[in-house]
Amino acid sequence: MYGIEYTTILIFLTSITLLNYTLKSITRIMDYIIYRFLLIVAILATIMNAQNYGVNLPITGSMDTAYANSTQSEPFLTSTLCLYYPVEASNEMADTEWKDTLSQLFLTKGWPTGSVYFKEYTDIAAFSVEPQLYCDYNLVLMKYDSTQKLDMSELADLILNEWLCNPMDITLYYYQQTDEANKWISMGSSCTVKVCPLNTQTLGIGCLITNPDTFETVATTEKLVITDVVDGVNHKLNVTTATCTIRNCKKLGPRENVAVIQVGGANILDITADPTTTPQTERMMRINWKKWWQVFYTVVDYVNQIIQTMSKRSRSLNSSAFYYRV
């Protein structure tokens, strides 16, 4: 009888020992698997980026997230505002402290010191070559000049909208525009653009494809050209490629963190390409021509109302890089 009890106790102790060994083995195996998994995740995390900017897509707009627009809960504490102005403004005011003065005035409207940036440009033509929009909100002041109406309207069309652009090889291929949103945008120090429409036999309509002198000239020595031709018709192009780059672009929609303020002029510029539609005036506004001090005072007074017509972007955007990126 005692032998049976001893055997039972021995079996019980042996079972407990085996169970303990098994549990420890399972624990070691699980620890190994978990640590190995975490090691792999840590290694991959150093290689991979959370946001993918390197897929080599020709996307030049829409790489940002629109935020719900509100100026009621003091979003300026985390927002930046860029104010672009011509050099003649600072020359006229002739005050080395004018930026500090305006910064203090913007503070009274809820914009903390350091959140407003003043960006100077030489003239409309120079600004057209490389319009860089760095801030969450961008206000571009353009003084009206009757001799530069076309340059102003094209610049406004460029920066107030997002464009998807691809390179064009005009030496090898013919091109056609598919719809009203499709435009050819040229930028450079000097852009002369000529076009020759083609028939179904790829023969020139009113021009010789072998002789650029017979092409129709649509732009001469300009810095920014937005070319619109008859949709659905192939064209042979001639462009001063040594000083100009041309891209085949599609208008994606409004760039809602940009507003253009026209200073002076009887009427606000119309950047609507379609003559049958109502002129586009949203985020395109006008201030009566005054001294530049009064212009800036007006901007400060109405800055919050202007921001209400805009939407903040998730990050700043370099318009030049956006245009040229492939």
Curated annotation (Swiss-Prot):
Keyword DNA-binding: no
Pfam families: VP7
GPR motif: annotated segments: 253-255
Secretion signal span: 1-50
Subcellular location: Virion; Host endoplasmic reticulum lumen
Keyword Membrane among record annotations: no
GO molecular function, one term: metal ion binding
Disulfide bonds: C82-C135, C165-C249, C191-C244, C196-C207
GO CC terms, sorted: host cell endoplasmic reticulum lumen; T=13 icosahedral viral capsid; viral outer capsid
Keyword terms: Calcium, Capsid protein, Disulfide bond, Glycoprotein, Host endoplasmic reticulum, Host-virus interaction, Metal-binding, Outer capsid protein, Signal, T=13 icosahedral capsid protein, Virion
Binding site for Ca(2+) 2: Q177, D228, V229, D231, D301
Glycosylation sites: N69, N238, N318
PTM comment: N-glycosylated.
Residues where Ca(2+) 1 binds: D95, G206, T214, E216
Region annotation CNP motif: where it falls in the sequence: 165-167
Similarity comment text for this entry: Belongs to the rotavirus VP7 family.
Subunit structure: Homotrimer; disulfide-linked. 2 Ca(2+) ions bound at each subunit interface in the trimer hold the trimer together. Interacts with the intermediate capsid protein VP6. Interacts with the outer capsid protein VP5*.
Role, per record: Calcium-binding protein that interacts with rotavirus cell receptors once the initial attachment by VP4 has been achieved. Rotavirus attachment and entry into the host cell probably involves multiple sequential contacts between the outer capsid proteins VP4 and VP7, and the cell receptors. Following entry into the host cell, low intracellular or intravesicular Ca(2+) concentration probably causes the calcium-stabilized VP7 trimers to dissociate from the virion. This step is probably necessary for the membrane-disrupting entry step and the release of VP4, which is locked onto the virion by VP7.
HAMAP family named in the record: Rota_VP7, Rota_VP7_A
Miscellaneous note of the record: Some rotavirus strains are neuraminidase-sensitive and require sialic acid to attach to the cell surface. Some rotavirus strains are integrin-dependent. Some rotavirus strains depend on ganglioside for their entry into the host cell. Hsp70 also seems to be involved in the entry of some strains.
Protein name (record): Outer capsid glycoprotein VP7
Species this protein is from: Rotavirus A (strain RVA/Cow/United States/B641/XXXX/G6P7[5]) (RV-A)
Lineage, highest ranks first: Viruses, Riboviria, Orthornavirae, Duplornaviricota, Resentoviricetes
